[in-house]
Every structure is written in C-alpha cells, then in structure tokens.
Amino acid sequence: RIEENYLEQAKNLPRVFAPVDEKLQKCTEEVALACKYLYAFMPYSDIGNYPFEVFLDYAENGVRLWKENPQVADLPEEIFLNYVLFHRVNEEEIAQCRTYFRAEIGSRIQGMNFREAALEVNYWCAEEATYHCTDDRTLSAISVYRRGNGRCGEESVFTVNALRSVGVPARQVYAP
C-alpha cells in the first residue's frame, strides 16, 4: 500500500520525485519505506516547501524507535504510521525536531510504559515552554522549544512532537 501510494504521488510530480528517489537509494530499506510513507501521504505543500533531509530525520527517528523499543514495535501499523512516524501535526512549519527531542527526553522515560512516559513528557514540555498569546503564524515544535513559549495550538504541536519523538502515539485534539 505504501509503495503504491508513493508511486502515484511520484507519477503526479516526476520532477520533484526524481531527486527524492535518488536519495532514497542511499537509505536503508526500512528508512526508505518510512520516507515513502511520509511522501505518499503528506500534502503537496510539504513536498514542495521542505527538503528531503527534513523528512529523513522523521523517518530515521521512527525506524529507530520501531527497532529499539518493544512497545513501539508492538503498536498496530496504522497507529505507528499515523501517530508516531508522521511528521505533520497541524498547520505548523515543519522542522527537524524528533531526534533532538528524543535525545533530550529519552533518559527521563527509560523503562516507563506509554502512560507513564506520556505524563513525564508532558512534565518536560511544561518545563520547556509556557503559554504566550500571539497572532503570528503557527511555529514549529523546535521553535516553541527554543523560544520557551507558544500559543495554545503551538504548545500542543510541541507536545505531540515530543511524545512522538519517544514513540508515544499522539495526535492533536481540540476540546471546548
């Protein structure tokens, strides 16, 4: 299914996908498949606006989690693909962050189940960023981290990326 959807996207944008295909040949089979999943299901705006290396970081982190964390490996494929591997959370700028966040958080959640890890990641996020009201464009997760604050939606994008960076399936949900 991933390969089929990737080839369909590539057929629609041959000049964009030719260099992507060249770079995929240099990846391991697992990382190439993860990248193909991202490209198969990402919006055209992401394909056109971000370099391959950004998505490679998400793919490499996801594959590493799948290989090294038994809890992640036990996830149903659809959950892993959509809520751990996938790069997009909302309409935020996409920037490399997952590998960095995993390095920052990993030791704090060592040996924890998903529930315990989710709580610890939430504490880490609260330590790193606070609420700040603005009307600016939605920042990337790494920008919120570096700035130390963000709007409500930015904080949730930050938290979802932090959770996904360590293999905890997460998505953004709005509730009144």
Placement of each model-derived feature along the sequence:
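Hydrophobic/aromatic-rich core segments of domains that either
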Residues: 107, 117, 123, 132-142, ...
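N-terminal accessory/pre-domain segments preceding catalytic cores
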Residues: 1-122, 127, 134, 144, ...
